[in-house]
């Protein structure tokens, strides 16, 4: 982002296997015995803490004992600012626009100063008046989720839905009375331990009737402007996705280094056999570094149907191949693969749907 800033080194303080370099920048282990002079580093260099906030205090203490004077925790606000600045620069470099919902005007397209950002010819659906359009962002929660540290009131457009509700059949006290749950009608609630919030997505696909449907998480909510629906409709937006996340060395390798690589390879082979027209695009996209995480979105009902019709057959086959994993985190691999697949779906359908991005929060 800033050519005047030069990164001298990366630090880590865990027991995992870490690379010796990232690009041409050296990677060093950080502890209270680290000899900075032997590493040819200066204690006057600023150190940015790019890890989770719960670790900042401990790492700051180590850095101070070593002798570093300028220690800058990367806050949520700083992370959002840097991420958006990087994405704007990156998209410009590849000849595309990085369009954020909060940058669009809540005015009719014909008078909006930003109307030129969107190619209205890409959609043939006219929603008409905003107040005639129904819209809900469903916030997914499990009956077994840990409570938030602080209560977070839902927005007027948000509705809570319980995923994996079938597992609370014998513990009715875990679900509020009249709770919206994913185990009625056509459902896959029993797959929740692997499919995570996707069991709620499947239920919404089969049962929700709103014109615009969103999916969020009880710890992760979209940061939407108050008039988000007006901005979406008046600028003829089809889809809102979370601001993309950068991962290294690639989207593919990021998944394979954390999960069973054979599940990824099976998924790619499935795409090659069943969606050959998309395979080359998938291969290229997954070699890149960006995807929208967390299985979050807001989209028109017709788009949701197109996405789910494409997505779930792939995930069912991947889950049949991979089976159950002993580790509960690793067992959620269909949910993690879905994050990458949703991003891929909208990449290969860029000419079909108008897409913008929005930031999200994380609640401890």
Question: Where are the model-predicted features located?
Answer:
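Conserved acidic residues
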Residues: 8, 44-46, 211, 238
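Short internal beta-strands
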Residues: 7-14
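Phosphate-bearing ligand-interacting subdomains
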Residues: 16-113
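Glycine-rich adenosine-cofactor-binding loop
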Residues: 1-3
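Redox-cofactor binding/interface segments in oxidoreductases and associated redox assembly factors
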Residues: 12, 48-50, 215, 242
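A short alpha->loop->secondary-structure connector
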Residues: 5, 68, 228
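ER/Golgi luminal nucleotide-sugar-dependent glycosyltransferases, focusing on the catalytic module
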Residues: 89-364
């Amino acid at each position: 982002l800033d050519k005047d800033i030069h990164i001298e080194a990366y630090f880590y303080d865990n027991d995992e296997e870490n690379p010796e370099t990232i690009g041409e920048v050296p990677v060093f282990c950080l502890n209270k015995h680290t000899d900075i002079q032997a590493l040819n580093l200066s204690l006057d260099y600023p150190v940015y803490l790019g890890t989770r906030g719960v670790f900042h205090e401990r790492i700051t203490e180590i850095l101070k004992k070593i002798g570093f004077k300028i220690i800058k925790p990367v806050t949520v606000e700083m992370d959002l600012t840097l991420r958006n600045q990087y994405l704007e620069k990156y998209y410009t470099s590849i000849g595309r626009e990085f369009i954020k919902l909060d940058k669009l005007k809540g005015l009719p397209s014909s008078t909006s100063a930003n109307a030129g950002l969107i190619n209205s010819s890409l959609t043939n659906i006219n929603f008409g008046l905003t107040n005639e359009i129904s819209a809900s962002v469903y916030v997914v929660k499990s009956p077994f989720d840990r409570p938030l540290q602080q209560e977070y009131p839902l927005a007027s457009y948000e509705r809570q839905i319980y995923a994996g509700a079938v597992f609370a059949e014998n513990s009715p006290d875990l679900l509020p009375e009249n709770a919206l749950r994913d185990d009625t009608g056509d459902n896959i609630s029993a797959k929740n331990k692997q499919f995570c919030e996707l069991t709620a997505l499947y239920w919404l696909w089969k049962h929700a009737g709103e014109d615009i449907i969103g999916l969020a998480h009880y710890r992760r909510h979209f940061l939407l402007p108050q008039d988000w629906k007006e901005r979406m409709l008046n600028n003829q937006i089809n889809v809102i996705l979370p601001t993309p996340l950068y991962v290294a060395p690639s989207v593919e390798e990021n998944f394979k280094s954390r999960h069973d690589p054979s599940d990824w390879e099976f998924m790619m082979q499935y795409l090659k056999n069943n969606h050959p027209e998309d395979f080359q695009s998938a291969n290229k996209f997954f070699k890149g570094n960006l995807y929208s995480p967390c299985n979050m979105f807001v989209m028109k009902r017709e788009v949701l149907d197109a996405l789910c019709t494409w997505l779930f057959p792939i995930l069912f086959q991947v889950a049949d191949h991979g089976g159950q994993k002993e580790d509960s985190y690793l067992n959620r691999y269909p949910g993690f693969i879905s994050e990458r697949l949703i991003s891929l779906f909208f990449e290969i359908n860029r000419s079909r749907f108008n897409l913008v991005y929005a930031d999200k929060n994380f609640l401890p």
